[in-house]
Amino acid sequence: MGIHQLMQFLKEKAPNCFRTLMLDYFAGRTIGCDASMAMYQFLIQTQSAGLTQIIELTDKEGNRTGHLVGLFNRTLQFLENGIKPVWVFDGKPPLLKSGELARRKKLKEEAKVKTELALEQGDMQQALLQNQRTTTISSIMKEDAIKMLQLMGCPVIIAPCEAEAQCAELCRAGKIYATATEDMDALTFRTPVLLRGFNTKKEPIYEIIYDDMIKELELTYEQFVDLCILCGCDYTEKIEGIGPGTAYKLIKEYKSIEGILEHVQKVNAEREKNNQNPKYTVPSKFLYQDSRELFITPLVQKGDELQLTWNKPDVDNLKKFLIEEKGFAESRIDNGLKRIAKKDPAGFQSRLENFFGKTTKIIHPNNSKAKAKSNKKTEQPQKSGGKKKI
C-alpha cells in the first residue's frame, strides 16, 4: 500500500518538489530499483483474458514467467538509455507488517473466489481483474529473477527487510542517484530522490526531490513521518476521521502524533458531553511509535559497506536459463541483444565495456563468495515463454 493518498497530497501541497522527465534524462545515472514492486507489476501486466480462460506466461513446469519477461525488458530499456540499474529485493518483512499482510492475504482469497465465479459466468474482463488481484510472488519466482538479473550482469541486493528502505539508504550514501518504485513510503524512509512511472517508454517519469518536498511542506523529517503514519501506512491502522489534508493541518498545529492524540481526546470528550458521536476513532492497536521507529531507523545494510560490482553478462548461461529452462524464444533474446548493439556500431561487447567500465553486481554479504565467481562473457537478451490457462 505504501502511504495512502500521499502522491495526490504532495501534488496539491508541495507541487514544486515534482519534475516530469523522459527516460533519456537519466542516462549515465545509477538507479536503485524496487524489484519486488516491479515483479508484481509485470505479473499483472502479462496476464490476458482468453475466450474462456485467463492466460499467463509460464515455463514448461507451470511456473509463471511474466515477471522475468518484464524485468528482462526493463533492464534492456535501462541499458539502451545508458542507465545503470541496481535491483533490490525485499527480505523478511517486519513483524509490524503482519497485520497488513494478513489483510492482503484475505483479499487475495476473496479475489480467487470472485475469479472462479466470473469464469463460470463467462465474464472474462471481471475474471481478469479479479485474477490480477490474486497475484503473489513465490520463492521460486524470486530466485529465478535474481538468477536472470545476475546472469545479465546487474547488481542484485537482497535487503534485510524492506527494499524501499535499502534503496533509500543507498541513495543517501551516494551509491545510487534515485530510488525507482511506486511505493511512496520510499520518501518516508528518506530517499533523496524518488522516481515513479517506469511503465511505458513514451510516458514521462515523475521525479520527486525529498529536500524540496520537506522545504515546501515546512515540516521536519520526524513530522513528515508522523504525517505519513496518519495518512495510513503498512505498519499500523490509522485514525478514522483523519485524511491527508486534516493530518497535515493537525501536524502543523500540534507538531506530533502525541500532540494530536491529546487534541483528539479533548474533541471526542466534548462531543460526548453533547451526546454526539466521536469525530475521530483511534484504533485499539495504534502502533504509531513502533511504526515511527521502523521508518526512522529501518533494518538495512549500510550503504557505505556495500560493494557494487557490474559484471559483463554471461550470455551462454543466460540463454541456457531463459530458453531451455524458462521457455523463452531464442529470437526474442537475440532481438534483445540487437537492441543494445544498434546503439554502438562496434557491437554489443564494446558498448557494455564502455558502459560498465570496471563492473557491478551487488552481493549480499552472506553469499559473497558464491556469487563473486560469475562467468565473464559478453552480452545481453530479451523475453518470451509458454502460456498457462486458468
UniProtKB/Swiss-Prot annotation:
Cofactor note (record): Binds 2 magnesium ions per subunit. They probably participate in the reaction catalyzed by the enzyme. May bind an additional third magnesium ion after substrate binding.
PTM comment text: Phosphorylated. Phosphorylation upon DNA damage induces relocalization to the nuclear plasma.
Entry GO CC: mitochondrion; nucleolus; nucleoplasm
InterPro entries for the chain: 5-3_exonuclease_C_sf, Flap_endonuc, HhH2, PIN-like_dom_sf, XPG-I_dom, XPG/Rad2, XPG_DNA_repair_N
Region: I-domain, residue numbers: 126-254
Function: Structure-specific nuclease with 5'-flap endonuclease and 5'-3' exonuclease activities involved in DNA replication and repair. During DNA replication, cleaves the 5'-overhanging flap structure that is generated by displacement synthesis when DNA polymerase encounters the 5'-end of a downstream Okazaki fragment. It enters the flap from the 5'-end and then tracks to cleave the flap base, leaving a nick for ligation. Also involved in the long patch base excision repair (LP-BER) pathway, by cleaving within the apurinic/apyrimidinic (AP) site-terminated flap.
Protein name per the record: Flap endonuclease 1-2
Organism: Paramecium tetraurelia
Lineage of source species: Eukaryota, Sar, Alveolata, Ciliophora, Intramacronucleata
